[in-house]
């Protein structure tokens, strides 16, 4: 047995494990396969080869049967005897040279440092009492068994342990002749330390414990250090392929921290042959604490170091393994302590694995990191950090230099050639220059599609595009690193931010020379430092990156000055830079510092704006023009530039923040400026400041004609002028005199070409307020002659912007003093292409005369009379577009137009003389389609608001802007406040000198903007009610004097029309006519679901369809599904299915369940003339004709009964003219009796008809106030028990509640 065992041990691979019986075991023990299994033949050949050295190959074939017998018997019967027999044959310990050649399976799974005891421990398979010499070249000295005996004496193996060891060893079986360090590295699994007492007992004094430290690099120490897990091997293999990953795929996405930490330390390592070791073998450092070298993150949870793609973190010696030495911890050890500290601080936002660019081929999610934090804190010297780099098994200490850091000719990073990138950038730039505005593709990616960090990252990404043609400089100092570039870029951005604050600093004493110097300083001094800082950029051209620069304070989300990044980006693009070869022709004259630059993020194409002979600017290109919004100029700025065309030349006059009646205009010559391209839509405080109406501030923002198309759709110009747009939040104060008319046709998502007439050469552009960054733009050329600032009423130009629709183009006509801007309204979701040029008359405030008839020309696709799906219909005065039906009446306009917006030309109403009754104003259409009904009313874009006197709300309209073309101008005249749209993105209320206040509440009552107009001073109160179901109207502005009429219009789904129309919420002809300045009337129409209250108005209110708004004179009641009780001075129409008590002559609702009857003749339901004839369903004088205007008293139901105390709560008793009978109601009775209406209001006027659905109600002989909603009215319904009305509102007193208690007693009777 001893000789057999010795023979077996002399041939470990051939007979013992490989050939004899191990692979011939039963399948139950062979079932466990691993990727490291070797063929049986190879093991057999290895055994034979080993036998040739030791002479034991033949013995393995002979003892195979005996081996099986010994295997089982030793385990079961002869365990103790086996240990004793080991002592008979003792082999000496193997020398380090022998250990160097230990095959893989000789390495015990329990060894961490490769002791011979572990090899012997593994070699004892199944408790077999034999010693395996682990290498064929090792002679069997007699000390080997002593070693094994000591191990076996210290430990007894159970069968389960033996089986486990057998399985492990079988999985590790390999060809001893082909075994090398590579295979050792591959096969090395997670190694367990043997018990310390066993190690000490095994090698007490032979010094073999120190062999690991003293062995040369090729020794077992290298094996142990480089033991890799299977996952690491797979990753190393994937990373070893030379042309696999490019820098863009490696996740080198421009994070400064990663680039500073990695690329400043990389050196041109030679390409290694594919046959070299897959896992790097560091030589000079201490061994790892654990046996595996899988990269791990420091200080972060394991989630951040998890593989985000199947092949992430490709770490290999070919790519970056030689630099990072298979582990970030080992690489950090080679760094100086200061560098390591900075490096770790730079990596605190992300794992070291990702930040070292070891992995993340394709990130699934974007991790926000503070790039500048890592770049600033990274104290890694470029040329002073010796990295212990081992290439090809040797130890090299290479000092990385700046040259090698930026240009790595021999590295495996397949960098994009610099020349090709430069050439590509130049070609793109030339193409951008050549492309004209008319030829832009509508599918361009515009920054308007981006928000927040993505838009900011786009700005940073564009820098190589403009600076890509700059030669890469190889600096000798680390200052030229990308870290420095980021810092300098940030500093330059702050510098520009500081200088952009000087934009409005120029005052009347500004001279051309001073402005020239200042502008040169801005054009060169600001942009050039940025250029210099970006000259030495990393060698790779980065792709579009979405990383948010959290440390860029000026680019952060809570941006203090929204215009700053825009101006910075613009100045980078709009000015010619000497070192970047982007040729951007500029006019001979430098830009004035007061110039309002468009807030364009990047001008991707060089623009040469050519000045035409008439002083208009020809924009040759307008690429990526989407929402071209100027940098927000707040109206309270020190000075706001206004551009004026004086004698055909473009001048900019600077109006101080406190304009006087006589404002001096200092013309400063301006160069031809490129069109605003790549506009930023910044919703920062200045942008949101649009809601802040600065009354005294001048709205003098230079606005130039711009076609803004959402998706790059360029708009055709009759005479294209430069695209400049300010989004200034300055609703004009009463005093703003100078103004620049915005000549902007902004179409949002509009694919149509807009024909905007060039500004006439005769005068300065009048100012018109910019609107919130919501989709509204302000298009229209006003040629307003230089009018004295005393004339407060300017023609407030308004945007014609369509959503998904063509823009109506407006041609302004010249007027003697002030020309009303063309009333161009756009309909959202308009797929037609209406370009309706029309000139609006200009009315001076004092004269009140209409300078010119407005002529409205319909666009090609959308005709006035046709219901275009997006067509824009324009009527001469007010035309309702009801499914394409053209109502040519000047007065009423049916509302239900799905996407068409009707533009009403016509003379503008004189703001000062409110006696001139503006025809009814039409409210908003269905989806915010704007319809301007009155001549002199201008509708805002998405939310329909009649500009002259009322504002309508669109359901999804962003903000409704009310502007009368002449009547309510920025400066003076009736300013229509804009109600907020349904989701009320921005409700803008413009305060004007004349006292007219209109409020529109949107469907879900997002924001209500209300303009307070005082006769002397303008006070604007802007109230926004976010997501309120049923917007409550904001209180009238403080200090209303003279004509103070509160007109608010809320349309259920954007419907609003002057006349009640079925399926269209009514729009009261708000401010339609106020006879005297003393007359104060407020009109409110409730939204679809009857949540807003209606305030009484001098003109009739028409209730919305299917809803009723409880309209008391003063207090609103919201969330009322019942009918609306309108205690209004003149007349109010109740909603269709909502009964309301109307104290004034008004049409009754169609299906009003208990509205009070009128005594005056009203139109029948289906459009019959208003005679007190019984209505369609058996009730007299029904209120609604389907789409037909109700002609009540006054001009188209403009009941101009003015009451000073119309806002009082007792307005029910104010004007008791007539009552409206409900549709299904009974005949009228002279006594007022509240209806049994679900929401029906109690009628309080003496002449009234009997209430329908009356349950034994006895008429009261006295006039009673309307009961509050859900309360019994004073009328004797239910025999005095009180009306069961679900929402009638009236002036109702406390007595109604007491009567309601009598209801129970009535039932008992």
Curated annotation (Swiss-Prot):
Which residues lie in Gly residues bias regions?
A: 47-58, 1279-1293
Effect of inactivating the gene: Developmental defects, early flowering and altered nuclear morphology. Lethal when homozygous.
Basic and acidic residues bias spans = 195-204, 396-405, 660-673
Q: Name one GO cellular component term.
A: nuclear periphery
Task: Using the UniProt annotation, give all residue ranges assigned to the region (25 X 2 AA repeats of F-G).
Answer: 2-677
Q: Where in the cell is it found?
A: Nucleus envelope; Nucleus, Nuclear pore complex; Cytoplasm, Cytosol
Disordered: annotated span: 1-58, 83-118, 173-210, 266-296, 329-348, 384-417, 467-538, 594-617, 635-680, 719-865, 1004-1028, 1068-1105, 1278-1309
Which keywords does UniProt give here?
Answer: Cytoplasm, mRNA transport, Nuclear pore complex, Nucleus, Protein transport, Repeat, Translocation, Transport
Q: Name the GO terms of the biological process aspect.
A: nucleus organization; poly(A)+ mRNA export from nucleus; protein transport
Spans of the sequence repeats are: 711-712, 804-805, 831-832, 861-862, 869-870, 883-884, 898-899, 927-928, 956-957, 983-984, 1004-1005, 1029-1030, 1038-1039, 1053-1054, 1089-1090, 1121-1122, 1137-1138, 1151-1152, 1153-1154, 1166-1167, 1177-1178, 1186-1187, 1224-1225, 1238-1239, 1255-1256
Compositionally biased intervals (Polar residues): 91-101, 268-283, 597-617, 635-659, 789-803
The biased composition feature labelled Basic residues covers 22-32, 1297-1309
Biased composition, class Low complexity, residue ranges: 728-741, 767-783, 809-827, 1004-1023, 1068-1086, 1096-1105
What interactions and quaternary structure are annotated? Part of the nuclear pore complex (NPC). The NPC has an eight-fold symmetrical structure comprising a central transport channel and two rings, the cytoplasmic and nuclear rings, to which eight filaments are attached. The cytoplasmic filaments have loose ends, while the nuclear filaments are joined in a distal ring, forming a nuclear basket. NPCs are highly dynamic in configuration and composition, and can be devided in 3 subcomplexes, the NUP62 subcomplex, the NUP107-160 subcomplex and the NUP93 subcomplex, containing approximately 30 different nucleoporin proteins.
Q: What else is known?
A: Represents a functional homolog of vertebrate Nup153.
Entry text on domains: Contains FG repeats mediating the translocation through the NPC by interacting with transport factors.
Purpose of the protein:
Nucleoporin required for nuclear mRNA export. Functions as an adapter and/or regulator molecule in the periphery of the nuclear pore complex (NPC). May interact with importin proteins and mediate active nucleocytoplasmic transport through the NPC. Involved in regulation of nuclear morphology.
Report what the protein is called: Nuclear pore complex protein NUP1
> What lineage is this protein's organism placed in?
Eukaryota, Viridiplantae, Streptophyta, Embryophyta, Tracheophyta
């Amino acid at each position: 047995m001893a000789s057999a065992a010795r023979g077996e041990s002399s041939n470990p691979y051939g007979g013992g494990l490989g050939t004899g019986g191990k692979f011939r075991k039963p399948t139950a023990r062979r079932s466990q396969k691993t990727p490291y299994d070797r063929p049986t033949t190879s093991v057999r050949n290895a055994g034979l080869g080993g036998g040739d050295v030791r002479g034991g190959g033949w013995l393995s074939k002979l003892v195979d049967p005996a081996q099986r017998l010994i295997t089982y018997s030793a385990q079961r019967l002869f365990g103790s005897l086996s240990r004793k027999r080991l002592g008979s044959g003792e082999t000496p310990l193997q020398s380090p040279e022998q250990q160097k050649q230990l095959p893989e399976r000789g390495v015990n799974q329990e060894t961490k440092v490769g002791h011979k005891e572990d090899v012997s421990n593994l070699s004892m398979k199944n408790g077999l009492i034999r010693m395996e010499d682990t290498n064929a070249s090792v002679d069997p000295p007699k000390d080997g068994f002593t070693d094994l005996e000591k191990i076996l004496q210290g430990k007894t193996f159970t069968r389960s342990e033996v089986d486990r060891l057998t399985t492990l060893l079988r999985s590790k079986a390999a060809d001893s002749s082909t075994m090398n360090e590579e295979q050792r590295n591959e096969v090395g699994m997670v190694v367990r330390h043997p018990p310390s007492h066993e190690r000490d007992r095994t090698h007490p004094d032979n010094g073999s414990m120190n062999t690991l430290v003293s062995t040369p690099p090729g020794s077992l120490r290298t094996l142990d250090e480089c033991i890799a897990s299977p996952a690491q091997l797979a990753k190393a293999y994937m990373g070893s392929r030379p042309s696999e990953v490019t820098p863009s795929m490696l996740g080198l996405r421009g994070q400064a921290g990663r680039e500073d930490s990695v690329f400043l330390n990389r050196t041109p390592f030679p390409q290694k042959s594919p046959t070299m070791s897959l896992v790097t073998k560091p030589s000079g450092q201490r061994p790892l604490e654990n046996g595996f070298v899988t990269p791990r993150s420091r200080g972060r949870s394991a989630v951040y170091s998890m593989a985000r793609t199947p092949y992430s973190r490709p770490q290999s010696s070919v790519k970056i393994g030689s630099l990072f030495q298979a582990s970030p911890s080992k690489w950090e050890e080679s760094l100086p302590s200061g560098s390591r500290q900075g490096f770790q601080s730079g990596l605190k936002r992300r794992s070291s694995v990702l930040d070292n660019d070891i992995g993340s081929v394709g990130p699934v999610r974007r991790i926000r990191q503070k790039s500048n934090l890592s770049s600033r804190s990274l104290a890694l010297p470029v040329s002073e950090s010796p990295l212990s780099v081992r290439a090809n098994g040797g130890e090299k200490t290479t000092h990385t230099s700046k040259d090698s850091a930026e240009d790595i000719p021999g590295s495996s990073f397949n960098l994009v050639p610099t020349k090709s990138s430069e050439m590509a950038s130049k070609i793109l730039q030339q193409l951008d220059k050549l492309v004209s505005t008319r030829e832009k593709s509508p599918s361009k990616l515009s920054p308007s599609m981006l928000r927040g960090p993505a838009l900011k990252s786009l700005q940073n990404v564009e820098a190589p595009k403009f600076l890509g043609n700059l030669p890469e400089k190889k600096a000798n100092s680390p200052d030229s690193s990308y870290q420095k570039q980021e810092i300098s870029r940030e500093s330059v951005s702050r510098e520009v931010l500081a200088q952009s604050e000087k934009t409005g600093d120029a005052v009347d004493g500004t001279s051309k020379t001073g402005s020239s110097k200042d502008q040169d300083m801005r054009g060169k001094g600001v942009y050039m430092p940025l250029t210099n800082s970006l000259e030495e950029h990393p060698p790779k051209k980065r792709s579009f990156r979405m990383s948010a620069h959290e440390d860029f304070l000026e680019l952060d989300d809570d941006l203090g000055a929204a215009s700053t990044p825009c101006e910075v980006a613009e100045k980078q693009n709009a000015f010619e830079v000497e070192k970047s070869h982007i040729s951007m022709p500029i006019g001979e004259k430098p830009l004035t510092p007061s110039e309002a630059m468009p807030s364009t993020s990047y001008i991707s194409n060089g623009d040469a704006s050519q000045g035409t002979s008439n002083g208009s600017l020809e924009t040759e290109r307008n690429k990526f023009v989407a929402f071209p919004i100027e940098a927000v100029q707040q109206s309270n700025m020190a000075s706001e530039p206004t551009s004026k065309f004086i004698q055909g030349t473009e001048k900019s006059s600077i109006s101080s923040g406190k304009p006087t009646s006589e404002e001096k205009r200092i013309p400063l010559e301006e160069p031809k400026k490129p069109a605003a391209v790549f506009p930023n839509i910044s919703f920062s405080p200045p942008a949101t400041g649009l809601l802040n109406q600065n009354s005294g501030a001048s709205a003098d923002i230079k606005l130039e004609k711009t076609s803004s198309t959402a998706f790059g759709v360029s708009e055709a110009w009759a005479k294209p002028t430069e695209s400049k747009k300010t989004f200034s939040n300055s609703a004009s104060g009463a005093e703003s005199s100078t103004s620049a008319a915005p000549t902007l046709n902004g179409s949002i998502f509009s694919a149509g070409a807009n024909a905007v007439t060039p500004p006439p050469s005769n005068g300065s552009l009048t100012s018109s307020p910019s609107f919130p960054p919501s989709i509204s733009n302000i298009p229209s050329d006003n040629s307003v002659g230089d009018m004295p600032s005393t004339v407060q009423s300017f023609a407030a130009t308004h945007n014609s912007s369509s959503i998904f629709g063509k823009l109506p183009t407006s041609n302004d006509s010249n007027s003697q003093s002030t020309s009303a801007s063309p009333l161009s309204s756009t309909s959202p979701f308009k797929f037609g292409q209406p370009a309706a040029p029309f000139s609006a008359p200009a009315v001076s405030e004092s004269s009140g005369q209409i300078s010119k008839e407005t002529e409205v020309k319909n666009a090609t696709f959308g005709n006035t009379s046709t219901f275009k799906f997006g067509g824009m219909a324009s009527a001469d005065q007010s035309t309702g577009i009801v499914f394409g039906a053209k109502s040519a009446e000047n007065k009423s306009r049916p509302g239900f137009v799905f996407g068409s917006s009707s533009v009403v030309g016509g003379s503008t109403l004189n703001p000062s003389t409110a006696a001139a009754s503006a025809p009814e104003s039409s409210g908003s259409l269905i989806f915010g389609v704007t319809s301007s009904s009155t001549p002199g009313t201008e509708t805002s874009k998405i939310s329909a608001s009649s500009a002259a006197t009322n504002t309508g709300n669109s359901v999804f309209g962003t903000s409704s802007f009310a502007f009368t073309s002449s009547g309510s101008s920025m400066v003076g005249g009736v300013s229509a406040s804009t109600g907020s749209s349904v989701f009320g993105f921005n409700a803008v209320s413009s305060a004007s000198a004349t006292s007219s206040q209109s409020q529109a509440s949107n469907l879900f009552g997002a924001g209500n903007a209300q303009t307070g107009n005082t006769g002397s001073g303008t006070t604007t109160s802007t109230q926004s009610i976010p997501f309120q179901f049923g917007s409550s109207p904001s209180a009238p502005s403080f200090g209303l004097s003279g004509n103070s009429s509160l007109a608010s219009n809320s349309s259920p789904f954007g419907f609003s029309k002057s006349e009640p129309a079925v399926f269209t919420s009514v729009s009261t002809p708000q401010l339609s006519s106020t006879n005297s300045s003393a007359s104060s009337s407020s009109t409110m129409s409730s939204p679809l679901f009857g949540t807003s209250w209606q305030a009484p108005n001098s003109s009739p209110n028409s209730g919305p369809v299917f809803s009723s708004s409880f309209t008391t004179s003063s207090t609103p009641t919201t969330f009322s599904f019942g009918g609306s009780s309108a205690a209004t001075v003149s007349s109010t129409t109740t909603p269709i299915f909502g009964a309301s008590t109307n104290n004034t002559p008004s049409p009754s609702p169609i299906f009003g369940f208990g509205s009070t009857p009128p005594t005056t003749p009203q139109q029948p339901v289906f459009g019959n003339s208003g005679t007190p004839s019984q209505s369609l369903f058996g009730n007299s004088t029904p209120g609604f004709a389907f789409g037909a205007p109700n002609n009540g008293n006054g001009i188209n139901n403009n009941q101009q009964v003015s009451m000073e105390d119309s806002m009082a709560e007792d307005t029910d008793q104010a004007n008791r003219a007539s009552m409206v009978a409900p549709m299904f109601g009974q005949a009228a009775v002279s006594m007022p009796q509240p209806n049994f209406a679900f929401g029906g209001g109690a009628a309080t006027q003496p002449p009234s008809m009997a209430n329908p659905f009356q349950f034994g109600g006895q008429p009261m002989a006295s006039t009673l106030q309307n009961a509050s909603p859900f309360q019994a009215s004073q009328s004797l319904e239910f025999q005095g028990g009180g009306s069961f009305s679900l929402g009638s509102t009236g002036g109702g007193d406390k007595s109604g509640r007491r009567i309601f208690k009598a209801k129970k007693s009535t039932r008992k009777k």
